[in-house]
Regions:
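Short, active-site-adjacent cap segments at secondary-structure transitions
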Residues: 1, 36-39, 65-66, 137-140
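Glycine-rich phosphate-binding loop and adjoining helix at the ATP-binding site
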Residues: 1-52, 145
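Short secondary-structure boundary segments
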Residues: 33, 60-62, 134-136
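Short glycine-aspartate micro-motif
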Residues: 55-59, 131
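Short beta-strand scaffold segments in enzyme catalytic cores
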Residues: 58, 64-69
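Histidine/lysine/aspartate-rich catalytic loop segments that bind and position anionic ligands
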Residues: 69-101
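Adenine-nucleotide phosphate-binding core of ATP-dependent small-molecule kinases
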Residues: 89-145
């Protein structure tokens, strides 16, 4: 059941997407959010393959998506971009790529904000591995200097 619609039309809220797509395609369908799907791919084929500890994938784009794994098993729908930040808004309203664009802040200032988000997640979950992806990941080379 679609519970939110951050990047799709709001008419999907309350829709059993698995049933709709399954009926139209005649195939079994599994629906998940983009961060969980990316996390499953990374754990099976990417840098998370074989990792047994706590692994967290973060998609950095319009918002902040998360996927959390422990001993190779996904803990679904973590939605950690919705954690409340000290200013009373969500972390993604403060530290996402969308926030950087909306607030017109420099990549340096954004990186400091995002680093604060990573430190917060590290305190909460002590992950053995962070995997960063999403639209902002194409700019990671710029953050090395």
């Amino acid at each position: 059941m679609a519970q939110s619609a951050a990047n799709i039309d709001e008419s999907w809220i309350g829709t059993n997407a698995e049933q709709v797509f399954g009926q139209h395609t005649g195939c079994p369908v599994f629906v998940t959010n983009d961060a969980d799907a990316a996390g499953m791919a990374e754990m099976r084929y990417g840098v998370g393959k074989g990792e047994e500890g706590v692994v967290m994938l973060i998609t950095i784009g319009t918002g902040l998506g998360t996927a959390l794994f422990y001993k190779g098993m996904m803990i679904p729908n973590t939605e950690l971009g919705h954690l409340l930040w000290p200013h009373g808004k969500s972390a993604e309203a403060y530290a996402s790529s969308g926030a950087r664009e909306r607030l017109k802040i420099s990549r340096k200032e954004w990186a400091e904000r995002f680093n604060g988000y990573l430190l917060h997640l590290e305190r909460l979950f002590s992950p053995d591995l962070f995997i960063l992806g999403g639209g902002e990941s194409k700019f990671f080379e710029q953050y090395k200097s």
